[in-house]
């Protein structure tokens, strides 16, 4: 069966139609927020009991209040359920992700001499408690467990936990449990969706209250994070998957088709565009996509064909390559792959993207699993202001200052004038003769 891949000719679109291409499926959260509000309130009031009820209602799982936390026996069982080769691949991925994030770690403290005797710097300490949210709705995602848990451990977070929806059997995905153990997290809880976010925001008898939650999720999860942002830090905005493959006229259309399908297969709420100024490449890629659908599971074909036939996906054909670049920067994609014989020539032109992958040997799928950089990336245009998940999401910095007497005498006169100009007498007094007198009086007492 041949599926339609929509070609959007940018020059033929009105401003309204162009803006529609830039919108994401989760842009309007109003309906989700109305659904999520009572769920949050129920968890706040009833804790574990509410989590057990929602496991049955939403996950079709029987999870009693004393089964919310994964047991050691469940961890042990997970290793018997996952193929040894898969465990080796999980370990391989963890090693690569760990190396990247270890290289990303800043010095614990640095100080610079600003003026003679004036020293200032930063000191980094880990956030006390962070929850890693691992989605499950459209499959199992041990890769997300790796991407969220590894930097937590590298950063030294004292309380790092995983929350994830249970399957219909009341158990957590086995590969996710294997990852948790390999990484060094032994606290995993069976609570997903908005109820999981509420649980770590308020804490329950079983689930610890956390300072921050990281990880992607459904619009229900995104809505819950938005509503609870004053109580728990919601982390990098990470909604449904999205990608752009930017291809010039030197690119291989079959590779463009292969890589376009990577993010499109995540679900019907994904967004995926091939953006090019080459009509020939666009048409050849359109044919190739239908060929590659023959090698995919029916469910993934349904997901990706839905995406590529609507306004959230397909092929964007521009008049010039510069126009293609402009569209990419306006879109600010989660993933952006540049296909060109000279990808580095185009790298500097891209200013808005969660990640930029270069060339035909760097497919999005490798970046998602084994390359090293974090694959939890800003979505919904957040890449215009936000960054990929990193060790810095698990750290907080505190400014450090120290003055010698020489440094104090250097800065005090300027500080005094500043304070008097702004009308702060106590500020001015603290750097006036009153300070010198206070120091002298202390010496006399001693």
UniProtKB/Swiss-Prot annotation:
One of its GO terms (biological process) is L-histidine biosynthetic process. SUPFAM superfamilies: ALDH-like. InterPro entries: Ald_DH/histidinol_DH (IPR016161), Histidinol_DH_CS (IPR001692), Histidinol_DH_monofunct (IPR022695), Hstdl_DH (IPR012131). One of its GO terms (molecular function) is NAD binding. Transmembrane segments: none annotated. Binds 1 zinc ion per subunit. Its EC number is 1.1.-.-. Belongs to the histidinol dehydrogenase family. The keyword Oxidoreductase applies. Pfam families: Histidinol_dh. Its cofactor is Zn(2+). Gene3D superfamilies: 1.20.5.1300, Nitrogenase molybdenum iron protein domain (3.40.50.1980). It comes from the Bacteria. Signal peptide: none annotated. This is Histidinol dehydrogenase homolog. It comes from Colwellia psychrerythraea (strain 34H / ATCC BAA-681) (Vibrio psychroerythus). One of its GO terms (cellular component) is cytosol. The keyword Metal-binding applies. Keywords: Metal-binding, Oxidoreductase, Zinc.
